[in-house]
Amino acid sequence: LRRLHRGEPVPTGLIPIGGLLGIGFALAPDDGRDLVMVVSVNGHGLFDTVTGEKIARDRDPDPDPDPDPDGSIPDAVPDLSCPGLGPIASARVRIAGLFGGGLHTTTEDGWTLEVVSPEWPHDRVLLSADGGIPHNGPHGENWWHIFDSNYSELRAAGFSPSGHTLAVATSSDETLWSHQAPDIKRSAGQFGRSPADWGAQSQLV
């Protein structure tokens, strides 16, 4: 993992998710770690946010031609949710992306995520520890430009409810960063006050 600007995490590779529509978070029932549900034109997938491991996959979810509160397609139900897979099959996951919804933009320990578009239609994602715009100090001190969607449409950006995972999803890929949870062994990232404390974990297919 290369790091720039006092530890800013920089993704080291790109693995596409063709036709990504949206993402949502859930908690693993066994140890409470963050999981991410990915919805695309090629089906639904559930991934570990730390390792990038694909935990479960549904390549052909029910298309739900009629509105159904228990439907499989997020835009077909009022709360933009879809059924969970694998270990969270008994739950529904709210999805943020092309059809609406949103992820958390702040964490309890003071991180803020913002999306700005100075070169519209391209979006930029900013991570800060100073409460957000207007930023206090120069770039690289208390705020960082961590992502530029100049190659694909931004679908969603934000934190998991736990605050342990940061995700940026576009129409072609997803990038995850992870905090160190005290009770979960992680491969990178520790709590702290600079992006060095967010390890860029994976870009999922």
Identify the meaning behind each predicted range:
Residues 1-205:
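WD40-repeat beta-propeller superdomains and closely related acidic/aromatic-rich repeat-like regions
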